[in-house]
Amino acid sequence: MDLAIEKGPAKILARIQPKVAMSMLTKMEAIAANPAARHANVEKMQGIKNAFRLRHGDWRIVYEIDPNLAVVRVTKIGPRGQVYR
């Protein structure tokens, strides 16, 4: 599957520490390569179909899997307290 990062999360990735951003991208690429596998620190989100969250330290990455388009789309990236609002 392809990995698509929306405009808002892309801006956040550009502003955070490069080492942290690269680590996040590496994890997201691994998920996009095999979304059906079990990945550490990933949980399905309630109330949103095909939506998951990845925990990366104090950061959360919310993404959706679109099996029809074969895309993993990152919709939100932020600190734990802000990403779920």
Task: Report the location of each language-model feature.
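Enriched for short, Lys/Arg-rich terminal
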Residues: 2-7, 11, 19-22, 40, ...
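Phosphate-binding glycine-rich loops and adjacent basic patches that engage nucleotide phosphates
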Residues: 21-26, 47
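A short, surface-exposed loop/turn module that caps and links secondary-structure elements
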Residues: 29-53
